[in-house]
Amino acid sequence: MEVIMAKDWSNCKTIYTIGATNHSEEVRASEDYYATEPKAVEVLLEAEKFCPVIWEPACGEGHMSEVLKKHGHIVTSTDLVDRGYGDISDFLNSDFKVEKCDIITNPPYKYALEFCQRAIDVLDDGHKVAMFLRLQFLESKRRKQFFLDNPPKIVYVSSSRLHCARNGNFSDATGSKSNAVAYAWFVWEKGYQGTTSLKWIN
């Protein structure tokens, strides 16, 4: 495994509310790792077209990357933490980038806004960013200016709940495959300054 660059920005073993009240005392997964079920990528690809080259900068154990490869994409997979898949690279602080690519990922919850901004910054005009985020990412004064400056081209809301699993464990009940959180795909196109469309998928 090639080490591109790593810097520990993720020392975040902190308690956060992650959904309904029955989850309010749960501890965030190690390094904020919640794997995305492959179906989430499948429904995105049914709704949205992407360029052949994809960068997945928070690849975890490759759940998203493998679906993208199955659909014929050339995928560069990186992550701050070595989980046995992809290359080690600090997306927020490294100079590493993939040329002429689109970016598709589920960013760490604590750094979601920073991931969105960084992804838009490193892309070439006309290329896309697709972030799998909680629907409530639309809220907050902190993110308002970001959305005004960088309006998503489209937000795909899942009409059926899609799942994330703590530490990538979808088979174990302790993996927190929970229906308590509503997710959406936020899609930006570099340079787009129009109105954000809202569509339903799944």
Language-model regions, residue ranges each:
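Class I S-adenosyl-L-methionine-dependent methyltransferase catalytic core
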Residues: M1-N202
